């Protein structure tokens, strides 16, 4: 089997009353995006086919697990940010016109996205799309980790990817909420990175 990765063109849908059109200016690549973008293909042997097309082989033994993806176009990009350039007729939509917004809407590796106003988080004046592009996936994951800990009756967390963007967010949340957090990192310089934002303890593990 083959994974096909392409850049395509789609029409920009005119916004309904409660929708806006966002000109996307930044979008992160999260692990969840990579899973959808590349699946389990052998990207080390990927081949460029034409100007906007890449193909990579998918091992036969993996194909049954990917059956739902066969012959399906799957737009990528969970979150991003940009500027609202068109708005529907509702007061809420009109209020967003010209504003920088963070967006959770899927298919964010696009130039333009038409989205419901409820999918947009308005940024303060001066905050750039680049600074806004990761305001959903990692923050909600970090908050979810703390909430899950509490619901399951625990009072502390151990995090083994502590120096990541997610890990740094989790550290700040745990300090604010009074949650004990043990941070595990894989590079000595990452110890100081976390201590600079208040982490204690930090464990360095060489694998």
Located regions from the model:
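Conserved S-adenosyl-L-methionine
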Residues: 176-180
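NAD(P)H dinucleotide-binding glycine-rich loop of Rossmann-like/cofactor-binding domains
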Residues: 55-81, 85, 100-161
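Short alpha-helix immediately C-terminal to the canonical SAM-binding loop
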Residues: 191
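Glycine-rich beta-strand-centered segment in the early N-terminal region that forms part
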Residues: 11-28, 40-105
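Rossmann-fold NAD(P)-dependent oxidoreductase module
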Residues: 169-173
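Glycine-rich NAD(P) Rossmann-fold beta1-alpha1 loop
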Residues: 161-168
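Conserved small/polar residues in nucleotide/adenosyl-binding loops
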Residues: 205-206
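N-terminal Rossmann-fold cofactor-binding loop
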Residues: 184-187
């Amino acid at each position: 089997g083959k994974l096909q990765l392409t850049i395509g063109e789609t029409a920009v849908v005119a916004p309904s009353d409660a929708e806006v059109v966002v000109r996307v200016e930044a979008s992160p690549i999260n692990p969840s995006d990579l899973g959808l973008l590349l699946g389990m293909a052998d990207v080390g042997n990927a081949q460029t086919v034409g100007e906007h097309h890449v193909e990579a082989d998918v091992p036969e033994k993996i194909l049954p697990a990917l059956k739902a993806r066969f012959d399906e176009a799957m737009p990528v990009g969970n979150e991003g940010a940009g500027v609202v350039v068109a708005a529907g007729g509702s007061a809420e939509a009109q209020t967003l016109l010209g504003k920088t917004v963070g967006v959770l809407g899927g298919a964010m590796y696009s130039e333009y996205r038409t989205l419901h106003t409820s999918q947009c988080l308005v940024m303060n004046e001066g905050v750039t799309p680049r600074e806004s592009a990761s305001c959903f996936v990692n923050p909600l994951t970090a908050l979810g980790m703390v909430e899950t800990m509490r619901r399951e009756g625990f009072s502390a967390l151990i995090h083994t990817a502590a120096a990541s963007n997610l890990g740094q967010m989790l550290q700040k949340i745990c300090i604010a909420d009074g949650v004990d957090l043990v941070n595990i990192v894989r590079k000595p310089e990452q110890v100081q990175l976390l201590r600079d934002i208040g982490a204690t303890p930090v464990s360095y593990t060489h694998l």
